[in-house]
């Protein structure tokens, strides 16, 4: 069970100019983690059926009128906006907070991008935090520095609070999936039946990784409200990949608990994707979060531009080539910046050395079981010194320079310009919106979710038949749509074969 899995649920809306298109390992170490048994557990393949990706959309949550997230708009001064819920949280006024919750937004961001839940967690104010969680305050939303309330809770180090936030995150995930299901089924029903084949080629600028990165040919069958995905890439993180012969089946007619099935075609077994976790699994995940770096990565698209790629040495002309069966115009993608931040103020020197040893072992193909890497039950940390910042000092601070609340930061930041090429075809039969609906079903595969997020950007005309996307901070993927055809298929390919046996533990990370 890993912290990484709590990031991978898809968004229900198009990203803004500075949306988080890349969120690898936000609350865990980058390369996968480890369990009590010493067995390596990479991030969950099907994590988005566990955790909400963007509870900032008010329609996804129960208390709709409380969940609007509305930071200050450009040109609007802080003196023009009042944040009474934030103020009483910072002051620890639980009685006033319980009154304000009935009539005010508890998902609103202040001028520093913090929600009331952010402040409660940073200050270690359990009463306020639990009251906000009881009213379904969004847990996934990020502040101006890119940190979620869960990330801040890990920094503060109160185990009970981390556990409460993690459970609420999973609950909001289930609500999100249930909310989206009718819309998704309607969109699938309106699509024609088709076969789609696409190829993945992964690359890295890290020499050790470039030798072990996989490629994959994925086959997608869509009929009615059923989808089947055949893949050879069972699990993939930036430090490890697992190959096999896997089929993922979504049956839109089945009950939600029966909709998603994974087939292991080599062992002839299947496993249903479950939604609930045991108490032990949750506690183990908290141990891992508390012993790992807190990580956030954002692909900033504020200054993105597309320019036609050129070909020819003497006489330059716009590059147009065939990709698979489709004629495509090639563009250079400029202005993409990958901003990553890593925090470790909650870790001991022993934790840091241990995590480094794990990464080195994995990069060399080592076996964690042999080296006895086992997470230890983590106790709550000693709280940081009490807050001395007044409300006036906090709210009047310059944007981007908010007084720090909570444990003193130990943060490393890095920026990298991401260079990419994209090929757009006017001939491709499928539209981007239709592709997004299909990808939303198979978004449990993390790399497919990255593809879905990337194509939500405002792209040049046509369909992206070939594109480069960032999958992890050190890894990019070239995705090529090789083949597309409309057609009908045998119903049998969307059902579990009779000779397959159920194995609930076949995919322990599921």
UniProtKB/Swiss-Prot annotation:
UniProt GO molecular function: signaling receptor binding
PROSITE patterns from the entry? ANK_REP_REGION (PS50297), ANK_REPEAT (PS50088)
Bias (Basic and acidic residues) occurs at: 1-19
Q: Where is this region: Disordered?
A: 1-35
Q: Where in the cell is it found?
A: Endoplasmic reticulum membrane
GO BP: protein retention in ER lumen
The organism's place on the tree of life at top rank: Eukaryota
Q: Name one Pfam family in it.
A: Ank_2
Give the transmembrane region(s). Answer: none
Q: What does this protein do?
A: Acts as a molecular chaperone for G protein-coupled receptors, regulating their biogenesis and exit from the ER.
- PANTHER family from the xrefs? ANKYRIN REPEAT DOMAIN-CONTAINING PROTEIN 13 (PTHR12447), ANKYRIN REPEAT DOMAIN-CONTAINING PROTEIN 13C (PTHR12447:SF25)
Q: What name does UniProt use for this protein?
A: Ankyrin repeat domain-containing protein 13C-A
**Which source organism does the UniProt entry give?**
Xenopus laevis
Q: What gene codes for this chain?
A: ankrd13c-a
């Amino acid at each position: 069970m890993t912290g990484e899995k709590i990031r991978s649920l898809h968004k229900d809306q198009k990203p803004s100019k500075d949306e988080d298109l890349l969120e690898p390992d936000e609350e865990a170490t980058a390369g996968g983690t480890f369990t009590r048994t010493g067995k390596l557990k990479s991030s969950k393949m099907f994590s988005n059926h566990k955790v909400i990706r963007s509870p900032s959309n008010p329609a996804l949550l129960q208390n709709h009128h409380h969940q609007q997230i509305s930071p200050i708009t450009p040109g609007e001064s802080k003196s023009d906006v009042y944040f009474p819920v934030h103020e009483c949280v910072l002051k620890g006024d639980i009685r006033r907070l319980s009154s304000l919750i009935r009539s005010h937004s508890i998902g609103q961001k202040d001028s520093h991008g913090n929600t009331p839940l952010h402040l409660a967690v940073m200050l270690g104010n359990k009463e306020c935090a639990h009251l906000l969680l009881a009213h379904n305050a969004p847990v996934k939303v990020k502040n101006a520095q890119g940190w979620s309330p869960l990330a801040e809770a890990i920094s503060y180090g109160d185990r009970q609070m981390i556990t409460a936030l993690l459970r609420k995150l999973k609950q909001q995930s289930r609500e999100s999936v249930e909310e989206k299901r009718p819309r998704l089924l309607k969109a699938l029903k309106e699509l024609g039946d088709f076969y789609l084949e696409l190829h993945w080629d992964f690359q890295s600028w890290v020499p050790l990784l470039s030798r072990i990165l996989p490629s994959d040919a994925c086959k997608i069958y869509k009929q009615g409200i059923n989808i089947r995905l055949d893949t050879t890439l069972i699990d993939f993180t930036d430090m490890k990949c697992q190959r096999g012969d896997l089929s993922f089946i979504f049956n839109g007619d089945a009950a939600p608990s029966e909709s998603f099935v994974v087939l292991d075609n080599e062992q002839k077994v299947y496993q249903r994707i479950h939604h609930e976790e045991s108490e032990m699994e949750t506690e183990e995940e908290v141990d891992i979060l508390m012993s790992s770096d807190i990580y956030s990565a954002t692909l900033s698209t504020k200054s993105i531009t597309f320019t036609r790629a050129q070909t020819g040495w003497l006489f330059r002309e716009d590059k147009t080539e065939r990709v698979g069966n489709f004629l495509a115009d090639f563009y250079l993608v400029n202005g993409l910046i990958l901003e990553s931040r890593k925090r470790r103020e909650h870790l001991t020197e022993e934790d840091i050395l241990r995590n480094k040893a794990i990464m080195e072992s994995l990069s060399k193909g080592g076996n964690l079981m042999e080296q006895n890497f086992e997470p230890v039950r983590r106790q709550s940390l000693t709280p940081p010194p009490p807050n001395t910042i007044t409300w006036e000092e906090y709210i009047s601070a310059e944007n981007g320079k908010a007084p720090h609340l909570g444990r003193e930061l130990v943060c490393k930041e890095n920026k990298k310009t991401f260079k990419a090429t994209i090929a757009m075809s006017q001939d491709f039969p499928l539209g981007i919106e239709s592709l997004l609906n299909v990808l939303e079903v198979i978004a449990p595969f993390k790399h497919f979710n990255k593809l879905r997020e990337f194509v939500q950007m405002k792209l040049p005309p046509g369909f992206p038949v070939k594109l480069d996307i960032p999958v992890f901070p050190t890894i990019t993927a070239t995705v090529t749509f090789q083949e597309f055809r409309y057609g009908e298929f045998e119903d049998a390919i969307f059902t579990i074969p009779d000779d397959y046996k159920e194995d609930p533990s076949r995919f322990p990370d599921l």
